[in-house]
């Protein structure tokens, strides 16, 4: 099974972001028929660790490792001693990964990002300690909004990045860590396997 761990923003934060994305040039291009591969708002998430393909027989090990990481977080060992509750985040700003055919536009994460990074680190360490696969890339919290590739003029991408730079969504608590199984598409499908409250 193909797995990743994620934090899902609440519906009001996603709706706020969706209203912003609707005003971008890439949304106008999509409405005109250009395949800019807008991300379905119901799938909007922040990936903490990508495990990739894991044997179904190891799913129990994955759950145990993630449960231990969340227990550490709840106990203050990860999210900061004396800081009760989940990290409070907000979506704001934005950027791009890649160029040309591999261009991806994303929204940045603001707020208690250090605590979110500590949780991502704990998740990755717990997976590695259990001998499970996990990201080796540095954690860069973001929410992908589109994969336009080279189907939009450079000027439109730059204009959308400038618009995103001024964006700041409402604050929200990252209330749970979710283990997600992805099934490649089109369209790709996500199935929530297990969730742990933070």
Predicted regions and their residues:
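Histidine-dependent nucleotide/RNA phosphoesterase domain, centered on the 2H-phosphoesterase fold
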Residues: 1-198
């Amino acid at each position: 099974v193909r797995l990743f761990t994620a934090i899902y923003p609440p519906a009001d934060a996603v709706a706020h972001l969706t209203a912003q994305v609707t005003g971008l040039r890439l949304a106008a291009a999509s409405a005109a028929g250009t395949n800019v591969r807008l991300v379905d708002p119901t799938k909007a998430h922040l990936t903490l660790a990508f495990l990739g393909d894991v044997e179904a027989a190891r799913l129990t090990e994955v759950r145990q490792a993630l449960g231990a990481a969340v227990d550490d977080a709840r106990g203050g060992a990860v999210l900061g001693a004396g800081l009760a509750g989940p990290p409070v985040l907000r979506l704001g700003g934005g950027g791009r990964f890649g160029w040309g055919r591999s261009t991806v536009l994303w929204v940045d994460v603001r707020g208690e990002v250090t605590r979110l990074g500590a949780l991502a680190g704990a998740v990755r360490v717990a997976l590695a300690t259990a001998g499970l696969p996990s990201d080796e890339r540095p954690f860069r919290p973001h929410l992908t909004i589109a994969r336009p590739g080279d189907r939009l003029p450079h000027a439109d991408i730059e204009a959308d990045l400038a618009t995103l730079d001024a964006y700041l969504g409402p604050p929200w608590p990252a209330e749970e860590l979710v283990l997600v199984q992805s099934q490649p598409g089109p369209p790709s499908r996500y199935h929530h396997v297990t969730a742990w409250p933070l």
